[in-house]
């Protein structure tokens, strides 16, 4: 009788992982999880000091990791004039003399959207530079820096806002839906490379705290009441969805929801 194959736990060991938006929150947790699996990680962020601090935190958490396996690249994804060239620079640095295996994009404009009656053309378009234009520029250039095969992946980020919008978040909900639709198109255009989306629910990050301000405690209580598990999400838990999509070579065009059952209540 042929023995069953032994499950592998080292699938990401030595893989090159690029995390765009990796200085805090879910993105930082993805960086840490990837390093924990033995990956070589490149972090992209817009704030030089945050990048420096994030690298220091990761090196402290993984002291046995080769310092050269954690690389930081500054890139302002909100600037439409430079976003394409900045993204190509990040791809070049992440690839080094090899190829990138996985790209994760968690970057987003985390400022609270204005009320519907105060919307302007600029306030509607601005979040789209990071949420739509930047991923498309990544997709445009990644074939030069990745092997187009099922072992390679691009994972985008939407959110539960797509299916259950909160009042005042129409613009962001629209972009979340657009990201999911775009991912399916990219899964076709970039095949056999895999393209997927993670759609988080209420995840408590520093950026969320900053946005909510004094309303934070009430928002947490409301989110917990909406969840079937009775709690909000942590970046560390949600990061596992991104790791799964790197490992499952049969997942493409998929949306992985990690929202504590909030869509059921």
Swiss-Prot record:
Pathway: Alkaloid biosynthesis. NADP(+) binds at residues 23-24, 26, 46-47, 50, 76, 131, 203, 205. It is an enzyme of class 1 (oxidoreductase). This is Short-chain dehydrogenase/reductase phqE. Short-chain dehydrogenase/reductase; part of the gene cluster that mediates the biosynthesis of paraherquamide, a fungal indole alkaloid that belongs to a family of natural products containing a characteristic bicyclo[2.2.2]diazaoctane core. The first steps in the biosynthesis of paraherquamide is the production of the beta-methyl-proline precursor from L-isoleucine. They require oxidation of a terminally hydroxylated L-isoleucine to the corresponding aldehyde by enzymes which have still to be identified. The keyword tRNA processing does not apply. The chain crosses the membrane at residues 25-45. Keywords: Alkaloid metabolism, Membrane, NADP, Oxidoreductase, Transmembrane, Transmembrane helix. Its EC number is 1.1.-.-. Belongs to the short-chain dehydrogenases/reductases (SDR) family. The keyword Oxidoreductase applies. GO terms for cellular component: membrane. It is a single-pass membrane protein. One of its GO terms (molecular function) is oxidoreductase activity. Gene3D superfamilies: NAD(P)-binding Rossmann-like Domain (3.40.50.720). PANTHER family: DIHYDROANTICAPSIN 7-DEHYDROGENASE. It is found in: Membrane. GO terms for biological process: alkaloid metabolic process. It holds the Pfam family SDR. The gene is phqE.
């Amino acid at each position: 009788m042929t023995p069953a194959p032994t499950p592998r736990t080292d699938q990401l060991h030595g893989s090159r992982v690029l995390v765009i938006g990796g200085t805090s929150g879910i993105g930082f947790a993805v960086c840490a999880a990837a390093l924990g699996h033995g990956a070589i990680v490149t972090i992209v962020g817009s704030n030089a000091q945050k990048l420096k601090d994030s690298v220091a935190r990761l090196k402290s958490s993984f002291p046995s990791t080769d310092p050269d396996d954690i690389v930081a690249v500054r890139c302002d994804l909100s600037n439409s004039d430079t976003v394409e060239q900045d993204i190509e620079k990040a791809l070049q640095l992440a690839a080094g003399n090899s190829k990138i295996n996985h790209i994760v994009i968690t970057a987003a404009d985390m400022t609270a959207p204005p009320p519907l009656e105060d919307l302007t053309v600029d306030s509607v378009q601005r979040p789209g530079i990071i949420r739509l234009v930047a991923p498309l520029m990544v997709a445009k250039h990644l074939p030069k820096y990745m092997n187009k095969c099922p072992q390679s992946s691009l994972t985008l980020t939407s959110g539960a806002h797509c299916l259950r919008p909160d009042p005042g978040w129409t613009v962001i909900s629209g972009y979340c839906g657009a990201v999911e639709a775009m991912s399916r198109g990219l899964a076709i255009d970039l095949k056999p490379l895999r393209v997927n989306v993670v759609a988080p629910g209420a995840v408590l990050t520093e950026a969320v705290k900053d946005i909510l301000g004094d309303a934070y405690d009430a928002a947490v209580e409301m989110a917990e009441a909406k969840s079937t598990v009775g709690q909000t999400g942590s970046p560390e838990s949600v990061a596992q969805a991104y790791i799964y999509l790197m490992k499952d070579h049969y997942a493409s065009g998929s949306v992985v929801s990690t929202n504590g059952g909030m869509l059921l209540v």
